[in-house]
Amino acid sequence: MASNKAMFTNDVPQDRLLAVEKIESLRKPAKVMIIGDVDTGKTTLTIYLANELLSRGFRVAIIDSDIGQKGILPPATISLAFVDSHFTSLDDLKAFSHYFIGTITPNQYFGEMVVGVMKLSELAMKFSDVVLIDTTGMIYGSGVELKRMKIEAVKPNLILALERNNELAPILKGYEDITIRLEVSEKAKDFSRSERRELRREKWRKYFENSKIVNFNLDDVLVTGTSLFQGEEIGDTEKSLLERLFKWLIIHGRKIGNKYFVVKVDASEGPRIVDKNVVKYFDFSKLSNILLGLIDKQGFCIGLGILKSINFKEKKIEVLTPVEDLSSVAEIRFGRVRVREDGEELGLLDREAL
């Protein structure tokens, strides 16, 4: 299987040329958002437009926000790249900047999705004539609200809507004056869930192939995206009480307001009745291979890491990362996908799990 779903082609429907001409007529710099269901050719359209606009002398930027099927590495981020030469796949582009989402589906992460696209759009506008924004295929249910929030935040000058049967109408209502509806190419290919997973596996593997283990002192960096270090550490009396009540061995515990959050190992088998409004717990066995974002002071992601271990007593965190220059890391942000460096995904965590 090829490592990318979308490649450059000139064999496109006639309306693509009309889209190029419309973009050409827009006041610059201009933002163009591309929306559509899964497997409607959004990324193929993005690649075509970028190459065509480059040929016409425009400076082009691409924002890849399809976090589960990224062309611009790595997955679980929104990425910005500037196009300086003709290319055939988003894989050919080198990212200029990223925004960390930390998972491969927008569910539970609407805020991050909107903020990420907005921040990268603002950055891209400083250095380009046209910003092309490729989006996820989440267009139904809560996906309608996500797309509308993105439109409200980014304020695109043009929306290109790849549509089969008017399925984008709930998203586009009120934005008809800035929308061009495009037909879905007959050549658009459907990908199964297993094919998508295999594509992602290869991208994870490629991203982490030259990684090394580094250690961070938790006193030197901000840790976010988790309750692990919020509130105050529980005392020995509280720890012993919780261990007796629930037959746990508590590795780490915090009191956050009136609630407890603990990392635990079961000391014995059997059911436990735990009021999660009072005590939230996380299994120590899962506190590894969690995706981490390495974040700079501006809130951008300089690269990813994989959590290998945490020494709570010594306040050390062991991270596998391909990032060589770590001097600008001000924050480590926890994601919600567990993945190994060979690309094997171990599952998604609920946002509230950590």
UniProtKB/Swiss-Prot annotation:
Binding site for ATP: G36, D37, V38, D39, T40, G41, K42, T43
Classification via InterPro entries: Clp1/Grc3, CLP1_P, P-loop_NTPase
EC number(s) on file: 2.7.1.78
Record key words, sorted: ATP-binding, Kinase, Nucleotide-binding, Transferase
Cofactor(s) listed: a divalent metal cation
Natural source organism: Pyrococcus abyssi (strain GE5 / Orsay)
Function description: Polynucleotide kinase that can phosphorylate the 5'-hydroxyl groups of both single-stranded RNA (ssRNA) and single-stranded DNA (ssDNA). Exhibits a strong preference for ssRNA.
Database matches in PANTHER family: CLEAVAGE/POLYADENYLATION FACTOR IA SUBUNIT CLP1P, POLYNUCLEOTIDE 5'-HYDROXYL-KINASE NOL9
Pfam families: CLP1_P (PF16575)
First-tier enzyme category under EC: transferase
Protein name per the record: Polyribonucleotide 5'-hydroxyl-kinase PYRAB01840
GO molecular function annotations of the record: ATP binding; ATP-dependent polydeoxyribonucleotide 5'-hydroxyl-kinase activity; ATP-dependent polyribonucleotide 5'-hydroxyl-kinase activity
Reactions that this protein is recorded to catalyse: a 5'-end dephospho-2'-deoxyribonucleoside-DNA + ATP = a 5'-end 5'-phospho-2'-deoxyribonucleoside-DNA + ADP + H(+); a 5'-end dephospho-ribonucleoside-RNA + ATP = a 5'-end 5'-phospho-ribonucleoside-RNA + ADP + H(+)
Keyword Membrane: no
GO annotation, biological process: RNA processing
